[in-house]
């Protein structure tokens, strides 16, 4: 429980620190979001390397996504992804109905615009993990009602 609280506090301070140290132009053109996503990317690479060192090779892309949704998500956020959908053409949607990094925020509509800065790190986390498993991807997040969110993973074919 204590490690969970520390992760939430660290994440909030990280977001706050990036936005406080930014100049006005950086906030407006999305550089803060990019910084947070790049931090998540590096952390995701490191975590996946550590989590998969003793596991067998994955058969395919779907197996990798299942690993992300079950094992990886459980280790980082203490629960599995609630729903994984795919069109079997390289697009996956991961839905978390009670995303831990958004549960501390109020559920009002006025807070939806601020949700993106709290999701950027996680988008990078997913992208970094997939990158270390040999999958190049684009990860975006969407929130329609707090604290539920959807992460869309678009696999880029080489």
From Swiss-Prot:
Transmembrane listed as a keyword: no
Q: What is this protein called?
A: Trafficking protein particle complex subunit 6B
Q: Name one GO biological process term.
A: endoplasmic reticulum to Golgi vesicle-mediated transport
Q: Per the record, GO CC terms?
A: cis-Golgi network; cytoplasm; cytosol; endoplasmic reticulum; trans-Golgi network; TRAPP complex; TRAPPII protein complex
Gene, per the UniProt record = TRAPPC6B
Keywords on record: Disease variant, Endoplasmic reticulum, Epilepsy, Golgi apparatus, Intellectual disability, Neurogenesis
Q: From the record, give the cysteines joined by S-S bonds.
A: none
Q: What interactions and quaternary structure are annotated? A: Homodimer. Part of a TRAPP complex. Heterodimer with TRAPPC3. The heterodimer TRAPPC6B-TRAPPC3 interacts with TRAPPC1 likely providing a core for TRAPP complex formation.
Q: Which disease is it linked to?
A: Neurodevelopmental disorder with microcephaly, epilepsy, and brain atrophy: An autosomal recessive neurodevelopmental disorder characterized by microcephaly, global developmental delay, hypotonia, intellectual disability, autistic features such as poor social interaction, language impairment and repetitive automatism behaviors, and generalized tonic-clonic seizures. Brain imaging shows cortical atrophy, thin corpus callosum, and cerebellar and brainstem atrophy.
Explain the purpose of this protein.
Component of a transport protein particle (TRAPP) complex that may function in specific stages of inter-organelle traffic. Specifically involved in the early development of neural circuitry, likely by controlling the frequency and amplitude of intracellular calcium transients implicated in the regulation of neuron differentiation and survival.
Where can this protein be found? Golgi apparatus, cis-Golgi network; Endoplasmic reticulum
